[in-house]
Amino acid sequence: MFPLLAFRGDRMEILKAKGIVKRFPGVVAVDNVDFEVYENEIVSLIGENGAGKSTLIKILTGVLKPDAGEILVNGERVEFHSPVDAFKKGISVIHQELNLCDNMTVAENIFLAYEAVRGQKRTLSSRVDENYMYTRSKELLDLIGAKFSPDALVRNLTTAQRQMVEICKALVKEPRIIFMDEPTSSLTVEETERLFEIIEMLKSRGISVVFVSHRLDEVMRISDRIVVMRDGKRIGELKKGEFDVDTIIKMMVGREVEFFPHGIETRPGEIALEVRNLKWKDKVKNVSFEVRKGEVLGFAGLVGAGRTETMLLVFGVNQKESGDIYVNGRKVEIKNPEDAIKMGIGLIPEDRKLQGLVLRMTVKDNIVLPSLKKISRWGLVLDERKEEEISEDYVKRLSIKTPSIYQITENLSGGNQQKVVLAKWLATNADILIFDEPTRGIDVGAKAEIHRMIRELAAQGKAVIMISSELPEILNLSDRIVVMWEGEITAVLDNREKRVTQEEIMYYASGQKKQNGRVA
């Protein structure tokens, strides 16, 4: 008997999941979900953290077994016991955390764990056909426009190049479907454009792509369909032509959300931090700027512009070669982060997991970590009760979703981890807060909360510096915008009337300098 195939228009349904259920202790992660993929399409799967997207992907790619439901490939029912089973059926996946071996070559990584002998599964006794492995790897690299050799060591590649290797790994068995989980989270604007070109090329060759991202502008641009999940359930889908940011956000969070806050007025006051002629290697070149109490100063620019490097000098992580730093009008020397903390400066770093938190510590311990000397008795004996009071206070103030202050921080969602980083600096009474990519990798609801917090902190009189690669974030949250290119400031733009455009920022971010002085 031939399998019953479903079609949408003239496109055949190549993957169908029906009534998928997955339970974990105390939670139904995926609740009776249907999901389908048609040939030659790009379908995005979106939802907040905890919506069930990752669990569903793991089921459809053989990492997890469902508790109920069925999966059909080309109309035939299948059971996946491992990712290899899914791979054999033409389903590949590229995870957000790239899974490569640094000390192996590109070609070895492409064939790792699958097939390095022609037509055979690799075993310990197999003789690796290195010529075939090199030739096939070169074909795949050429297909996606990669400019590096199959013999290159992976440890020497950039993040974007590593992702190209992952795409080649996914293509090595000529799949019908590739799942991509947050593929643009660590890419520059140019690298993201190149990835989208690759995705469109894959679609033209008959390969469907399931795209998972928190970046709604990317989702709406690249997708033929958008499927929305919330609380483990499939909420609905939208087709191209029906995409609308407000509609998508409401489907994701179940309520109206003000993505960028309105009506939170800031009144810039005295200069809180001033930097004059800061220099460091060839990364920061004579940088001068000031941020006032009660304002949000946005820093825009492409990757490599020197924004993060500048703030690491201000925070004392790196040592300036020349230049001066003034806090509240007083010249200061900041030789390390401890000096910066004493000056009332807090840094919410780009990589919260590596630089902002100790993931294996509790929420309480992370919040009080920079304040231990201040809240301990005689600077020696920890005051457990005081630690609990401070932690409970900031968990409540910032609406951090955690079972208790004794929850291990690693178990929180990305948005709540970001709030813990913010809480620890607010607990030090920092008056100058530096946010580096504050909403990277967090879902829409949490983004809206962070956006509101940034504006509210400025309204309370804090001096806020915000680095962001998301131009809508820069344009909607900043009172003034500093644009950098290759370590230099090319423009400072007045954005109090919210009249600066993305085109204007990109003009200066590409190296063009503002004439007739800076607009302050």
UniProtKB/Swiss-Prot annotation:
Predominant cellular place of this UniProt entry's protein: membrane
Its job: Part of the ABC transporter complex RbsABC involved in ribose import. Responsible for energy coupling to the transport system.
Topology in membrane: Peripheral membrane protein
SUPFAM superfamilies (UniProt xref): P-loop containing nucleoside triphosphate hydrolases
GO CC terms in record: plasma membrane
Domain of life: Bacteria
Assembly information from the UniProt record: The complex is composed of an ATP-binding protein (RbsA), two transmembrane proteins (RbsC) and a solute-binding protein (RbsB).
Species the sequence originates in: Thermotoga maritima (strain ATCC 43589 / DSM 3109 / JCM 10099 / NBRC 100826 / MSB8)
Pfam families reported in the protein's UniProt record: ABC_tran
InterPro entries in UniProt: AAA+_ATPase (IPR003593), ABC_carbohydrate_import_ATPase (IPR050107), ABC_transporter-like_ATP-bd (IPR003439), ABC_transporter-like_CS (IPR017871), P-loop_NTPase (IPR027417)
Catalytic activity as recorded in UniProt: D-ribose(out) + ATP + H2O = D-ribose(in) + ADP + phosphate + H(+)
Domain ABC transporter: start-end pairs: 15-256, 266-511
Documented EC number(s): 7.5.2.7
Repeat found in the keyword field: yes
Keyword terms, alphabetized: ATP-binding, Cell inner membrane, Cell membrane, Membrane, Nucleotide-binding, Repeat, Sugar transport, Translocase, Transport
Protein name: Ribose import ATP-binding protein RbsA 1
Class of the enzyme per the UniProt entry, highest EC level: translocase
Lineage, opening ranks: Bacteria, Thermotogati, Thermotogota, Thermotogae, Thermotogales
Residues reported to bind ATP: 47-54
